[in-house]
């Protein structure tokens, strides 16, 4: 299940969520919150929901930051990286043995952040032109918030891609890497699971391509009219 636009907007729980989570727990359903957001750790997400009145164990959260750290560690153990992102991403990378390096890193890794600026772009472009590889936590162009739709990871990465001529590798949904990890954490096969999300271009296509049943909610980014633009 996705989080932003499905479970909450900002710090506001969406209608019906409490009843849905109560049903999952009462029926002993295996579930995982699979979020493309890389800003917070699973513990921080757990505490955020607790403040809204939902008590859910930390083990029920998996983020694109964790997926990105796992991918980098599998590609190049003990790699170094210049990171554009929030503490949730930096912490996940540290835990995977990836060190920070703003001189000659193996990777430039980008996620959501509130500290993004022109100097960040200049630094990333310079490092990539010198040989660093560009990785992004997810391909979401926009995301829902209490203020409305806001720029997300891909909107921050696009200027770097355009300036370098390099295309980032996006680890989060709809990348099957993240979906397969989610299934392993749940201990189920794809035909036994469903993906609930608010985005046709990430959540729903990820579920389809991984063989899951899919459920689109209209409380986030995708509207009923938007659905007509997709062939699936």
Set out the residue ranges of the language-model regions.
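Asp-based, Mg2+/Mn2+-dependent phosphohydrolase catalytic module
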Residues: 1-29, 38-62, 69-232
